[in-house]
Amino acid sequence: MIKTKEVTFVTILIVLCVFISTIHAKRYIEYPIRLDLGKGCDPRFPTAACYKRTPANPYRRPCTTANRCRRSTSSTRVPSLKTFVEIPPM
């Protein structure tokens, strides 16, 4: 009885080893692609080059009338600096 169990166990082990060896195992687990990572970046080992760069200070000064910025709704004409400061010829 014990001999039969040993033979059955060894036979099952051999069959399992044959089936396991024929399966093509992957070297690593493939994760779904994340959109915030750059192309070719590994999510397990992200580097600074993988992420989209954002400026340290994204604040921009607003455009004022004194700066004479281009405006689409501006109907008033801003006078130039020469009209405010007229230097008489000497």
Curated annotation (Swiss-Prot):
Cell signaling peptide that may regulate plant stress, growth, and development. Mediates a rapid alkalinization of extracellular space by mediating a transient increase in the cytoplasmic Ca(2+) concentration leading to a calcium-dependent signaling events through a cell surface receptor and a concomitant activation of some intracellular mitogen-activated protein kinases. Residues 1-25 form the signal peptide. This is Protein RALF-like 29. GO terms for biological process: calcium-mediated signaling; cell-cell signaling; regulation of growth. InterPro entries: RALF (IPR008801). One of its GO terms (molecular function) is hormone activity. It is found in: Secreted. Coiled coil: none annotated. It comes from Arabidopsis thaliana (Mouse-ear cress).
